């Protein structure tokens, strides 16, 4: 599936790009299409596989949040009348994950089954989606936001938004944080909820990819996973702080334009 050098490079790219609103799937797919000669339908399952590495890094980083939520699940299931402080977040994750699957699975199947483009055309498709991501980020204001617990409408909007991240070039963190900011969450809560909702969504995606036999597991794919985890764990704290302060919309738009232009070179 991957050579050793490809696995290492892709793992590093995934580990670095996951925490920034620039589409790690788009970045790894762009590398595979541009430099490794893969088609877009070949690149996407590999990109999803590498997300498992950064998922593990996110679980380690958000371990206290994850622990509280897991401990709260039994009480959440047993009683809906005796509400606990973490219940709104559990409901948010359950509903948003379900919506992500409903929206994202058909998109993933369509792209992997019907989009056999490669080379400049595939690069241009990813570039267009990066431009869309950048424009979306430009339209979102971080002013007049507040810290609050998520509700039903927040779950619906965020879950649908996350589903569209199945399209390479659409940043999962970028589109979900944008959705949460539009719902008037402050930046810190938007980032925290965005990455918490990525944990069940990525787990479900990994199970789906595995059941459909879309990824061939070998030693090199494990190496790629390890590098994604290691670089993700080392960079997550710094990059999340950077993501709160830096506007990455121009990066997405600029890289997207360059990617589209490669089709004509």
Swiss-Prot record:
Its EC number is 3.6.1.27. Signal peptide: none annotated. It comes from the Archaea. It catalyses: di-trans,octa-cis-undecaprenyl diphosphate + H2O = di-trans,octa-cis-undecaprenyl phosphate + phosphate + H(+). It is an enzyme of class 3 (hydrolase). The keyword Hydrolase applies. Keywords: Cell membrane, Hydrolase, Membrane, Transmembrane, Transmembrane helix. Disulfide bonds: none annotated. One of its GO terms (molecular function) is undecaprenyl-diphosphatase activity. GO terms for cellular component: plasma membrane. InterPro entries: UppP. The chain crosses the membrane at residues 42-62, 90-110, 115-135, 160-182, 195-215, 222-242, 245-265. HAMAP family: Undec_diphosphatase. Catalyzes the dephosphorylation of undecaprenyl diphosphate (UPP). PANTHER family: UNDECAPRENYL-DIPHOSPHATASE. Belongs to the UppP family. This is Undecaprenyl-diphosphatase. It comes from Methanococcoides burtonii (strain DSM 6242 / NBRC 107633 / OCM 468 / ACE-M). The lineage of its organism: Archaea, Methanobacteriati, Methanobacteriota, Stenosarchaea group, Methanomicrobia.
